[in-house]
């Protein structure tokens, strides 16, 4: 268990209020340098800012371990390359972030639980936020280089994802609980290969999808429970010019034995789908009558893209 957090925390935690961002980062770096292994978060409540992954690291949350993420936006600077509703940009760091990593995981019976006070205010999407979105739409539609799309400034209030893995390979998300999220809950963006299983997701804020796979391929999602404020499982493929530039469909996705307790849609496609979606198979999943739709494909005349080979079986 290279890079285990127990000893690091014993040296640095005081009164349960120490922000452990640096301690976690050091443990992940040590684990990566040693060739990989598990970074263990022990039982207890640990306050932290963003967690940035390196290859060959499993962040393991022991039972009754709670990672509590701060809600101070400055903790999530400097900005990192991410995406917002299908458009690439530099924004506040996601709470758990990986870029160009391989063989990474979050496992264990612990809980990810961000503090939500600031993000709840940002849910309201005031005029400066809407103006910032228009600015980002314009930059994306005119092919402004991504590094110039700096959105973590002023009152833009573009909320960070809870989990955002970007261009990663061999991903495992297993067993842990999620309790609330600033924006999309789990966003797997241009990732290749992975398993998402045994998750318990409860998040009822604005835009809180259960899981979003965007321009990703070769994933299995199984035995998860989704109780969220938007759609449960969402398959996306980028928006307009960015997606046409990246030219990467979302494909080869299996979803099985998952339950949705509350939310809008069991399986959604789009509306970011300009790169195309194909080969999605959902079976043996359940949703209550209160869910608006079992399946919903969303697009508009500007998106382009395609939807091919969608199967749903034994869904009720």
Which ranges hold each PLM region?
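Beta-rich accessory regions
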Residues: 24-30, 34, 283, 301-316
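Surface-exposed acidic, glycine/proline-enriched linker/cap segments
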Residues: 1, 76-96, 125-158
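Short glycine/acidic-rich loop motifs that flank beta-strands on beta-rich extracellular proteins
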Residues: 36, 47-50, 70-72, 92-93, ...
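N-terminal extracellular ligand-recognition/capping segment immediately after the signal peptide
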Residues: 34-82, 89-92, 111-112
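Parallel beta-helix/beta-solenoid
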Residues: 97-121, 130-144, 166-178
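Single conserved hydrophobic/aromatic residue that forms the stacking wall/gate
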Residues: 1-9
């Amino acid at each position: 268990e290279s890079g285990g957090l127990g000893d690091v925390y014993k040296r640095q935690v005081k009164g349960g209020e120490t922000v452990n961002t640096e301690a976690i980062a050091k443990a992940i770096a040590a684990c990566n340098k040693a060739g990989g292994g598990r970074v263990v978060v022990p039982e207890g409540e640990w306050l932290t800012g963003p967690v940035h992954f390196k290859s060959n690291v499993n962040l393991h949350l022991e039972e009754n371990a709670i990672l509590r993420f701060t809600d101070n936006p400055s903790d999530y600077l400097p900005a990192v390359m991410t995406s917002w509703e299908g458009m690439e940009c530099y924004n506040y760091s996601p709470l758990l972030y990986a870029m160009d990593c391989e063989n990474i995981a979050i496992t264990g019976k612990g809980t990810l639980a961000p503090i939500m006070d600031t993000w709840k205010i940002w849910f309201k999407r005031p005029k400066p936020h809407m103006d910032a979105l228009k600015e980002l739409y314009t930059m994306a539609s005119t092919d402004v280089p991504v590094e110039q799309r700096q959105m973590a400034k002023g009152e833009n209030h573009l909320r960070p994802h809870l989990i955002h893995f970007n261009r990663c390979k061999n991903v495992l998300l297993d067993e842990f609980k999620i309790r609330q999220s600033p924006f999309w809950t789990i966003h797997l963006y241009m990732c290749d290969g992975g398993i998402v299983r045994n998750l318990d997701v409860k998040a009822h804020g604005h835009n809180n999808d259960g899981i979003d796979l965007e321009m990703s391929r070769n994933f299995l999602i199984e035995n998860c429970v989704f109780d969220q404020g938007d759609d449960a499982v969402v398959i996306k493929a980028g928006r307009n010019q960015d997606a046409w530039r990246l030219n990467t469909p979302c494909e080869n996705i299996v979803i099985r034995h998952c339950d949705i307790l509350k939310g809008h849609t069991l399986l959604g496609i789009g509306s970011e789908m300009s790169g195309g979606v194909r080969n999605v198979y959902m079976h043996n999943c359940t949703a209550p009558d209160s869910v608006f739709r079992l399946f919903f494909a969303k697009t508009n005349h500007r998106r382009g893209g395609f939807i091919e080979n969608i199967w749903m079986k034994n869904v009720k």
